[in-house]
Amino acid sequence: AEDHKAQTMQFNKNATIVSSRMNEIDSVFDQLHNVASRLLELTAQTGSPFVSDENRKLFAIEATAMKGELFQLANQVDSKGYGIFSGLSGGRAPFELDNQGVITYSGSGANKSLQVSHNSHLRQNFAGDDVFLNLETANNKFSVFDAVDDFVDSMNFPLGAEVSGNLFSDGNSIELAFPA
């Protein structure tokens, strides 16, 4: 009976831990949603015939700042200091930024879980490559960081350059070059 009581107490403790971590993760996902929404707003604004080259440069600056915010959120740690998106890699930052601005994932592709009953385990975190790098479309996978880079690059072309950036069109980022 004591073993059963101890096991039940451990399951309850584990459920509390998972619930707390999920609240922290929900907060990060809310912030990610806000950044993605703003990026989509910028994309919609670029379709306006009243957007000047100067506005496009400002959009590029804002999108670059949002990429930095996405990078910080991707490396967010929980109250215990573990990376929310590091998989099983623990306390180190799962995403790295090189000198060329390329972001790579060095976390684990697996997720942590805790046992909360005899037959149930609940996830404690997410693998960052699934959240940020391996987003799927009907045709392929893409990185949210690369999509933002594509958008920024397209904003650096003047309006008459016959190049268009389309962030998250059909879940992907594309660049179209129109015939002259």
Predicted regions and their residues:
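Amphipathic alpha-helical polymerization modules
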Residues: A1-G91, L122
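Bacterial flagellar/type III secretion structural subunits and associated motility module proteins
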Residues: A1-S20, D26, L88-A180
